[in-house]
Amino acid sequence: LNKTKVKITTIQILDEAGNEDKIELLTEATKEFNGDCFIIDYDESEITQSEGNKTRLKIYKDKLIMIKMGTLSTKMEFEENKNSTNMYTTPYGSFDISFKTIIYDYSLNELGNGSVYIEYKIIFDGAEEALNKIMIDIN
């Protein structure tokens, strides 16, 4: 396991005017390569309102799987032009979350350094809403 620094920026577009909610997390993580993907493990913080949670990113060339464990738990899979539905568990109950990945841009080198960019829309009752962006920088 290698120690690494990870910067994760999440942006949610709030309205038609393009107003956005932006959260940045800079954290220490562990990084390993398991043959077909890089695995990044890190602890969430109060910045992400998920303190005490652990997150694992499994980063493949064509998709990313995000697994959150703790008081909030979910498994989200991002693959370009694919829809996905996952269970999202909170202390207040569980619900299904559906989303469509619009862009998946993998720019990691053979050491697992670089960036991954994802754009996805959360789908509520069959209607696409809430454009979200995730930028992951690993070095």
Across the structure, where does each feature detected by a protein language model lie?
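Flexible glycine-rich active-site/ligand-binding loops centered on an Asp-His dyad
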Residues: 135-139
